[in-house]
Amino acid sequence: MKTIAAYLVLVFYASTALSESISENLAWNKEFSSESVHGVFVLCKSSSNSCTTNNAARASTAYIPASTFKIPNALIGLETGAIKDERQVFKWDGKPRAMKQWEKDLKLRGAIQVSAVPVFQQIAREVGEIRMQKYLNLFSYGNANIGGGIDKFWLEGQLRISAFNQVKFLESLYLNNLPASKANQLIVKEAIVTEATPEYIVHSKTGYSGVGTESSPGVAWWVGWVEKGTEVYFFAFNMDIDNESKLPSRKSISTKIMASEGIIIGG
């Protein structure tokens, strides 16, 4: 394991609590190799203000966020009134959608859990470009570039974010430190709970830009945090993807690494 102090200035703002130290654990690469995947995993421990990754260079490289952007999109929607509250029902118009689980009325939590793209495209259109740009700037979210269309800039447009920036944003959300109401931050945090056991709770969101090609692969994400006792572990995973069959690797690799670190059960 080697310390990569030079990356601190590159990937974190000085005010970020998780910027005290960054180290590389190259042993994690075996999990990527075993599944023939090229990617990165970042794990940050709140109590020690430290982060570990298998690839510091890739961790500071920005990629399109895809559906991980549903986290800030939901918060911005709540802040602007595009989403009234967590009980608002987003009506299905009866038209066929890309995925069957999207073809029903959904509330906020349900829309996030099934990653309903049409719902969040509707939210983004109601927020509008001016307010969307304002909040991405306030959140220091990636490059904050909404070029490419108000309802698709995070799917196929110009928005980019690194794994390090993802954990920075998630830490701010966890601490209710984003420039948004505490009540709305709590709503979003509850909406992204994906696993709850007696030992730990996982808040997370996946993302997937599409497979791309071998020469220009797409990107698959899994980001979130684990609350375990008094400790909080923030994580961000991304990988190149040129075959949809590899999509499960985003969770399986992350789970194996976190299990090896004694954080969750699995692997």
UniProtKB/Swiss-Prot annotation:
UniProt modified residues of type N6-carboxylysine: K70
UniProt keyword annotation of Hydrolase present: yes
Gene name per UniProt: bla
GO terms under biological process: antibiotic catabolic process; cell wall organization; response to antibiotic
NCBIfam families (UniProt xref): bla_class_D_main, blaOXA-5_like
GO terms under cellular component: plasma membrane
Entry GO MF terms: beta-lactamase activity; penicillin binding
Highest taxon above the source species: Bacteria
Function: Hydrolyzes both oxacillin and methicillin.
Active site: residue positions: S67 (acyl-ester intermediate)
EC top class named in words: hydrolase
Catalytic reactions on record: a beta-lactam + H2O = a substituted beta-amino acid
Regulation: Inhibited by clavulanic acid.
Descriptive protein name: Beta-lactamase OXA-5
The entry's keywords: Antibiotic resistance, Hydrolase, Plasmid, Signal
E.C. number: 3.5.2.6
Residues given in the record as substrate binding sites: K205, T206, G207
InterPro entries named among the record's database cross-references: Bact_Transpept/Beta-Lactamase, Beta-lactam/transpept-like, Beta-lactam_class-D_AS, PCN-bd_Tpept
Family to which the UniProt record says this protein belongs: Belongs to the class-D beta-lactamase family.
Leader peptide range in chain numbering: 1-19
